[in-house]
Amino acid sequence: MKTLNTLKNNILRSIAVLAVLFSLNSCETLELEILESPNALTPASSDIDFYLNAMQLNMASFFNGVKDEGMQLTRMSHLYGPFYENAFSTTQMSGPWNSAYSNIFTDYNNMVPRAAEKGWETHIGIAKFIKAYAMITLVDYLGDVPYSQAALGVENLNPGIDSGASIYDAALALILEAKQHFSVPAQSPSNDLFYGGSRANWSKATGTLELKLRLQRRNAADSNDATAINALIAGAADNLITTSSSDFQFKYGTLNASPDSRHPAFVSNYELAADVNSYMSNSYMAEFVAQKDVVDVRANYYFYRQDDDVTDNDDNEIPCGNERRPSHYALSDIFCYIGFNDVTPSESTSNGYWGRDHGDNDGIPPDGGLRTAWGLYPIGGQFDDGSFTSTEGQDMGLKGAGIQPILLSSYTHFMIAEWSLANGDAETARQFLASGLAESFSKVTGFAAEMGAAGAVEFRSGASVDETAFLGSLTDNINAYIDYVAGTGATSLWNTTDDKMGLLVQEYFLALWGNGVEAYNTFRRTDKPTDLQPLLKTANNDMIQSFFYPRTEVDNNNQLTQKADHLVKVFWDN
């Protein structure tokens, strides 16, 4: 797979594609009835390969625009809140909406007929995959949306909405057609940003998207889905992403220029020294470092601690340090920071993980050089070697050479585990839980090497983590963790819990770092886990079931009526 560094040389030869790159970081809202998006390619300005690259870049932009909301709602990252009804504005989905309707769907309509004339089956298959993914995710986040009448320009300036179920059916049809396109030898794209033109990998990604769609609506009882899912699983080696070599991910580079090729989260965490601009979730970090009797080495790759002891800081920097936990918080709920004792604060301990609680919207103190930052995986940041120094700027870690983890091999294993458990096969579910964990650990610990780094991780001067000991014990620690969670022994978590689905989903969340889409969907589909950290300032737990339509779309489309509230469920959530 090629990074955006490689892509840049080609893009600079086309002003049209350069405009698409700028749109990756755009938050502007363009209504469905705008006839020509300033970021969209036109037949006069681009060839088929440029259209394809534009769709791929907008696929990355679309995913980046929806992943954070899902992470915040599932406590993977911090939600400011303070309440669900006002946590997100009616413009929250404007960016993804624009990426889908003004860019992906429009480029699809322009590209596919031209590719069909040339018989470029691979191009068509990729386009159908990307369109299907966007369609599915729009339904997952928004419910019923315009589809059959959308992206038609002057033919329909006020497209009506289609039911989420019908859009899923249309997306499934595109997926099945894409599979057929990938089965035909054809012209390869000149610059495939995901798979380098590999039809085999695109076919596996398409099968995995089909599995995701059918599993997602399993509670809606489509009679054909069970047979299709079982067939996909039976031929998993050929049908699905089961190893990391076929991971569907968008790779970033290290170019700090215009256009910036680095992972967006790297820029927000490492652009300036000691200026991390977001908070980690206290409860999510605790799952890695405080809730089990085994070491989870992924913590060193996911999170970078700038400070070694939260208790050493004053009330201006950590104001909750002198507060009592809310009455609706159980004693087992993390509050303020990991190790905080709100009954006897002097007995508090800290290992430096500095985040916030779910829905904490307090003011922002001068703690940009103290907060825990995103680490090495998946944004290309700094591995946590225990040196406890503030972020030093743009040259740390992999310098932004990260990924958007859209459909990874570990996700496939967890989806199969869920399907097996939901159908009463606990032993198969356990086996796929174990293999999903193994895939996750392998991906995370091998990430630096995958992205082209000379070493597995970077240990710096002043590190308190012993490099030889850490790397030498990786395999033992990974095996111990998998055995502790999903082993066959009588004392494993799997064999001692009464809530196997809850355990499975919780472990899936820990593997999903960087992908809030699958976490948000899985939470609503399974109603697991049941012990997520409550909102800080209210016991009300009416979590967002779907997002509001973008305000400007409602204002400008007389066929679109805003939802009554955030509790409107999507069709498969029952």
Predicted regions and their residues:
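Sec-dependent bacterial lipoprotein signal peptides
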Residues: 2-25
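C-terminal functional modules
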Residues: 413, 421, 438-574
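Beta-strand acidic-aromatic groove motif in beta-rich domains, primarily in extracellular
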Residues: 64-73, 144-145, 225-226, 518-521
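Alpha-helical transmembrane segments of integral membrane proteins
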Residues: 12-13, 52, 125
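Short, compositionally biased low-complexity segments
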Residues: 23-34, 76-84, 139-149, 467-482
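Structured, solvent-exposed acidic/aromatic patches
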Residues: 46, 77-448, 497-499
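Membrane-proximal, proline-rich intrinsically disordered regions
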Residues: 27-74, 80-84, 91, 95, ...
